[in-house]
Amino acid sequence: MGNKISKLTFSVITPAYNTAKYIGGCIESVINTGYDLNKIEHIIVDDGSTDNTSDVVKKYAKKYPHIKLYRKKNSNWGGVMNYVKNNKLIHNDYATICDSDDQITKKAFDKINKYAKDDDLIFGCFYRWNGKKQLFPVHTYYYFRSCNVYSKWKDKNIPPFIWLLHGVYFKKELFYKVDDLRENLHYQDSIMLMHLFRNAKSVRFVNKMLAKYYSTRPNNSSEIINNDSSTLILLNNLQQMAKYNLPTPIATILIYFTKLRKYCVKHKIKFSCTDAPHFNNSNFIIRFACWLAYFFTGTFRLFSKTKVKKSNKKIKL
């Protein structure tokens, strides 16, 4: 009896916009985790949908009191996060973000409950899927060295692959420290994750599948990167990261998004950081692949090192 592990409470944040076709699957995935629903709150924010997304949510909310629906004017993903933060909607120990077309895996909360050791930020693994079959597992755990826990992170130690929020859990107190995100723009999830990471005192990596990421849904932001405006938005995010001296995540995003990289080459855009990109926190295979891609794709040409200027002024995220 004395050794029984007390159960953590969880908040699931779901931004929703015109996803009536998919949101039922998201809601049911939370219900079907097998975790005590009294210890879960599912915060669903309808970001000005013009379809019947809210009607679908209301039907579930009548049956399941852990579901909380909020409606607001459209301001995109960043606007939803600002709304949740500024209205203090999170009440539980840990929170995670599950977009309305994505899903939580079974037993995900039990796994976090087992492995969390009062860490501020927890990274899990996730599946990329097409809505029917699981495409392939993404083992985030293996992007890092064998150590499970990192404490007191320094800017230069931020690992390369931290720009996806799937399977990521964070303390509510950490979430409330994040500055407002930019509204009406795509790709604010990567910026938010940088904020979380920089403010976390303890980060844990759990080699468990915690989410399903519907990466091939039509009009998914990851599928419209070839759109010129999307390229410019992502470029703006990278320039913001450069201000905070985050060369490694910038490098991995440039490696991953070919169109963005070519745009930077064409327009002679370079990123100035006091440190050069490195992949030292990844395991050997990932580290070798990243270095190879970094030079083979010419990404190394997009960086210019700046000298460190002594200043007492603190940069606030």
Where are these predicted regions, by residue range?
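Membrane-interface aromatic/basic loop that binds lipid-linked glycans or pyrophosphate carriers
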Residues: V265-L317
